[in-house]
Regions:
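Short, charged interaction patches at domain edges and termini
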Residues: 1-10, 45-55, 95-128
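Exposed loop/turn and edge beta-strand positions of beta-sandwich/beta-sheet ligand-binding modules
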Residues: 34, 58, 117
Length: 128
């Protein structure tokens, strides 16, 4: 399996264990979906080759959306849970993983008719 897909699948399965019925992928959920929810977004695989070896990084973006901007603590806790799942990852079926960097943003989101709170995690994993 492609390493990027293997990481994506692992995160999706583990997050669904923590938040059943609140984790989505591929497309954002329909308009009537209850908040808060997690959206496992885009991922990127980068090869870094030198003369004798290839090193790889996978970057994974995960979003948390909430329709109550006053409940920032809920978004923050969900982001923390996602980071814990990411840090606990050591191995998948075919690869050994290490979480290298995490960037976290929480911001207002006015892309819908109701104001949202939008949390974004950018996760950088190394694997071999």
């Amino acid at each position: 399996m492609d390493p990027q897909q293997e990481l994506f699948s692992y995160l999706l399965v583990e997050l669904k264990k923590l938040y059943p019925d609140n984790v989505y992928d591929t497309f954002l959920p329909p308009d009537n979906t209850p908040y808060p929810f997690i959206y496992v977004g885009n991922s990127q695989l980068i090869d870094d080759a030198n003369k004798s070896a290839v090193f790889w990084n996978v970057y994974q973006i995960i979003h948390v959306f909430h329709n109550n901007p006053k409940q920032r603590g809920t978004v923050s806790k969900m982001l923390l849970d996602i980071k814990k799942v990411s840090r606990e990852l050591n191995h998948t079926t075919n690869f050994a993983w290490s979480l290298k960097n995490v960037s976290q943003d929480i911001m207002p989101d006015t892309s819908t008719s109701i104001p949202l709170l939008h949390g974004v995690l950018s996760l950088e994993f190394k694997f071999n």
